Amino acid sequence: MIKKFFITGTDTNVGKTIVSSILLKKATMSGYQTAGYKPVSSGGQKKSSGFFNQDAILLKKSSSIILSDREVNPIAFFENAPPHILSKFQKRSIKKEELSLGLSNITKKSNWILVEGAGGWYTPLSCKDTFSSWVKQEKLTVIIIIAIKLGCINHAILTEKAIISDQIKCGGWIANNIFPKDKYNMHYIQTLLNYIKSPFLGVVPYFKNKNRINFKKIKIKLPK
């Protein structure tokens, strides 16, 4: 059975990609053929073949199957701004059919796929469509990444309610410590446990060096 998940966050810069890389590694260790997919990205670095997004690079490295840059990230904008705005200015439309085609191609190679969105749940793809409408169309199970910081509780509750109201399955949430641990972190998480009804998959600790992560020591559960 092929498992397909969509990673969303309570905001931008909540650590979606780092958590995605951990989940991909965990799934690989569980015997799955894993693939990370970043259908739309903004903010890139120049390469000989053009430019590529850093998040997509990490997803590619964390996947167990071999994927090309284009397979991982078919739509990439160089500037760091909302994709639908860049799409308008650069006259490069973002079509849901293109996102679906990329996902379909990866599905032929992998049985555990993690799709990383951009920003939060209702990030626009165009003036008419949001990422959430595409997720619903593809029947993807959603995982919420919550950065533990001031304001995260309200954002997390709103995000889960929005997903449920869209009649989409929420497979769980992960608390991500993006700042060095302080005395209130566990109180944030305990409050979230009281309010968020979706399965709690675990806590990702703060990493001083994100290039030296011991994946085996991170105790998060894979979504079902």
UniProtKB/Swiss-Prot annotation:
Question: EC no.?
Answer: 6.3.3.3
Q: Where in the cell is it found?
A: Cytoplasm
Q: Which cofactor does it need?
A: Mg(2+)
- What is the enzyme's main class? ligase
Protein's UniProt name: ATP-dependent dethiobiotin synthetase BioD
Q: Where does substrate bind?
A: S42
GO MF term list? ATP binding; dethiobiotin synthase activity; magnesium ion binding
Source gene?
Answer: bioD
Lineage here is: Bacteria, Pseudomonadati, Pseudomonadota, Gammaproteobacteria, Enterobacterales
Please give the HAMAP family that the UniProt record associates with this protein.
BioD
* A GO CC term assigned to this protein in UniProt: cytosol
Entry similarity comment: Belongs to the dethiobiotin synthetase family.
**Summary of subunit composition and partner proteins:** Homodimer.
Per UniProt, where does Mg(2+) bind? Answer: T17, D55, E116
Function per UniProt: Catalyzes a mechanistically unusual reaction, the ATP-dependent insertion of CO2 between the N7 and N8 nitrogen atoms of 7,8-diaminopelargonic acid (DAPA, also called 7,8-diammoniononanoate) to form a ureido ring.
Question: What is this enzyme's catalytic activity, as reactions?
Answer: (7R,8S)-7,8-diammoniononanoate + CO2 + ATP = (4R,5S)-dethiobiotin + ADP + phosphate + 3 H(+)
Q: What is its main location?
A: cytoplasm
> What keywords would UniProt list here?
ATP-binding, Biotin biosynthesis, Cytoplasm, Ligase, Magnesium, Metal-binding, Nucleotide-binding
**The organism sits in which domain of life?**
Bacteria
Keyword Ligase applies: yes
What residues bind ATP, as annotated?
A: N13, V14, G15, K16, T17, I18, D55, E116, G117, A118, G119, N176, N177, N211
Q: Where in the sequence is the signal peptide annotated?
A: none
Q: Which residues form the active site?
A: K38
Q: Name one Pfam family in it.
A: AAA_26
- Repeat among keywords: no
Coiled-coil segments, which residues?
none
- Which pathway does it serve? Cofactor biosynthesis; biotin biosynthesis; biotin from 7,8-diaminononanoate: step 1/2
